[in-house]
Amino acid sequence: MIKSYLGIDIGSISTKGVIIDENNNILASSYLWTKGNPINAVKEVINELHNKIKGKAIKIVSVGTTGSARKLIGTILNASIIKNE
């Protein structure tokens, strides 16, 4: 099982997500428009990331959020890090 970390940047214009391993290698990434709805944008980013890692032995051990909706999404995802840019 590969220990990995999920990072999400939820901005007013775009939402970006990345999954990295312990050596900072990017395992999957996603970039979508927020379209004024950060919750739906994050759902789409997570679905896209999930599809990219499907079938791989990856375990997300920590989540971090940043961006204008960092507190909202960080609370929803129970993020260990909610960081202002």
State each model region's role.
Residues S30-T34, I53-E85:
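Short beta-strand-loop/turn "lid" adjacent to the catalytic site in phosphate-handling enzymes
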